Amino acid sequence: LSLVVGKGVVEWIASRTGEFNCFGTDVGIGWAKHGKIVAGVAYANWNGVNVECHIASDGSRRWLTREYLTTIFDYPFNQIGIRPDGTRYGANRITVVVGEGNTDSNRFVKNLGFELESRLEAAHPTGDLLVYRMFRDRCRFLQVTHEQKLAA
C-alpha cells in the first residue's frame, strides 16, 4: 500500500460518499493498492482551529493500518496550517458529520475515538445528521509530535 495526496483523492471520496459538492480546494490523503485508491480522507473548511473530515473506503478493511491512521491524524493536528514565518501548526479539533442511517460510518468514527457532540434533526435525506468531534489531546494516533519527528 502507498500514500496518495491530491485532488484525485478528494474526487474519489466525493464519488464514494455521495456528497453534493466536490470539496472545493480541499486536501485529500489516500491509500492506494496497485495504483487504485482503496481509502481516503478529505479535509474541508479549515478555520485555524477546526477542520472537517470526510472519510471513505472501498468497503474493505485492509487499509486500516497504524501507518495510515497516524498519517491521516498527523496532517490535520500537526501540519494543516502555515504561519507567516513558514512554520506549520495544526487544528485543535476535527469535526466529522455522518448521516444517522449510516450505521457502519457511525460505528467506525466512534471506534477511531470521535465523540458524539450534537444531532442536527432532519438535516439529511436519511434523517438526522450526527456531529462528532475529536480533540488533538485525545487522539490516540498521535504518538509523537510533528516537531519531534523533524528533530529525529
Protein language model regions, located:
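Conserved acetyl-CoA binding element of GNAT-fold acetyltransferases
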Residues: 48-60
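Short amphipathic alpha-helix that is part of the acyltransferase structural core
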Residues: 1-19
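Conserved beta-strand in the GNAT
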Residues: 35-45
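Short hydrophobic/aromatic beta-strand element in the GNAT-like acyltransferase core
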Residues: 26-31, 40, 129-131
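Glycine-centered recognition micro-motifs in short, flexible terminal segments and loops
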Residues: 59-71
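Conserved active-site alpha-helix within GNAT-family acetyltransferase domains
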Residues: 101-118
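Conserved GNAT acetyl-CoA-binding A-motif
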Residues: 78-98
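Conserved catalytic-core motifs of GNAT/GCN5-like acyltransferases
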Residues: 97, 115-130
